[in-house]
Curated annotation (Swiss-Prot):
The gene is nodS. Keywords: Methyltransferase, Nodulation, Transferase. It comes from Bradyrhizobium diazoefficiens (strain JCM 10833 / BCRC 13528 / IAM 13628 / NBRC 14792 / USDA 110). Belongs to the NodS family. Pfam families: NodS (PF05401). The keyword Transferase applies. One of its GO terms (molecular function) is methyltransferase activity. One of its GO terms (biological process) is methylation. The lineage of its organism: Bacteria, Pseudomonadati, Pseudomonadota, Alphaproteobacteria, Hyphomicrobiales. This is Nodulation protein S.
Length: 209
């Protein structure tokens, strides 16, 4: 699937009242519950980054857990819908940008990236996006990744899904926890993983042993 086709698909989905049934699907609620639980493991985040906000369902859950939240999405419609949904919070910054090109000097202590990376053209682009994300994650801090599995994403016309991307993240981060969310539907099957970036206190502690 080309990038133009991806964007056209996203535009159509974002035009409906409940895109991807994010507010009404039991599967999506199960997925969000796991992502939120993992996000809260280390307490509230001083500075968090959410990559891909869809229509704001998870952003609305994540915002109260952060002192500062930066939301990045390539689709202006997604940013606008989420901004309207989360209007009561003033600590959210909005960036319309491809994650491969997003750049900041800020180091985040929580990054959440779910159901996003399979929209990239190929594994080379996924790897580049992952390197960019890892560079923005502070040492000893958490990244939450979620995605439909490889077989499903490839059936949708994408290059790869969860298993491939998890292997790429494991090249530079430490996998701490993995959860499998699924239903009887062939398209409702995803993996959610909590990663930790080695370094800082943990690296010094390991060096002393």
């Amino acid at each position: 699937m080309t990038q133009d086709e991806n964007h056209q698909l996203l535009e159509r989905e974002l035009a409906v009242d409940d895109p991807w049934r994010l507010d009404t699907s039991a599967f999506e609620q199960q997925r969000y519950a796991q992502m939120l639980r993992m996000s809260r493991r280390d307490g509230d985040a001083a500075s968090a980054l959410e990559v891909g906000c869809a229509a704001g369902a998870f952003t609305e859950m994540l915002a109260p857990l952060c002192e500062r939240l930066t939301v990045v999405d390539v689709m202006p419609q997604a940013i606008e819908r989420t901004r309207l949904r989360t209007g009561k919070w003033s600590h959210i910054s909005w960036v319309t940008c491809d994650i491969q090109r997003f750049s900041t000097t800020e180091q985040f202590d929580l990054i959440v990236v779910a159901e996003v990376l399979y929209y990239l053209r190929d594994v080379v682009e996924m790897h580049a996006a992952i390197r960019n994300l890892v560079s923005m994650l502070a040492p000893d801090e958490t990244l939450i990744f979620g995605s439909a599995r490889d077989e499903i994403c490839q059936r949708w016309g994408h290059a790869a899904g969860a298993e491939t991307v998890i292997a790429l993240f494991n090249e530079s981060l430490s996998e701490i926890e993995r959860r499998h969310c699924c239903t009887g539907s062939a398209s409702e099957d995803c993996l959610i993983v909590r990663f930790l970036k080695p370094g800082g206190a943990s690296a010094q502690s390991n060096a002393g042993h």
